[in-house]
Amino acid sequence: MVAGGGERVVVHPEGWNRSPNPYSYAIRSGDTLFLSGLVARDVHANTAVQGDVAAQLDVIMRNGADILRAAGLGFDDVVSAKVFLADAADFSAMNAAYRARFGSRPPARATVRAALASPSHTVEVTMVAVAGAKEAVSTGGRPNPNLSAAIRAGDRLYVSGMLGAADQTRGDAGAQTREALARIDTTLTAAGFSRADVVEGLVYLTDFAHYGAMNDAYRAFFGKDFPARATVGAGLFNPDGLVEIMVTAVKAP
């Protein structure tokens, strides 16, 4: 997923304290910057910042801007993000604060409810940014102000988390997986990619009782030479949603 890679550069904004935990705030390889999960933290004092989700997200985005700037990038270069919320009730407030940071081409995104490392944290955000030309991929539906269906950056495609919840799939994890993958397939095709180009997937499940049904549908979709994958238990923000799937694809030269 890295063009022009081979290097591994730690990105650390000037004047910031080192994280007390064993990670770097960001790593740059070639044209791609991988940011660690950011929480509301005073990076000079290494202390948590209290406040509601909007206040905490503001701190996260200001810190994110510093990291991006240190790598010669900005929010326009962010191609993919994952948002983790401690409380589902914060979803709307988070979205309002989040979209203020991005213009008409927000990154691909998945948002789930998850336990965070500290009870003082309400939200955590990870991001991937890529230098150079990028384009949002449209599948013809109504634009979502919070995310793009996918972002293409060179030979890579970052696809948002897709759900398969609908009246006809309610309560059926296998059917929802098939529908989510069909929507992913439509997005891949719109960008000039195919399912054979998918290199990694992330599956969120609301209940691991659905693991077998999800796996059966997932296996049938890809057939063979499966992409790398992680499957995680998390809360989804569609009340009927059982499965959400996010993928990255790389097109062969």
Please place each PLM-identified region on the residue numbering.
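N-terminal presequence-like segments and the immediate start of the first folded domain
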Residues: 1-62, 66-80, 85-199, 205-253
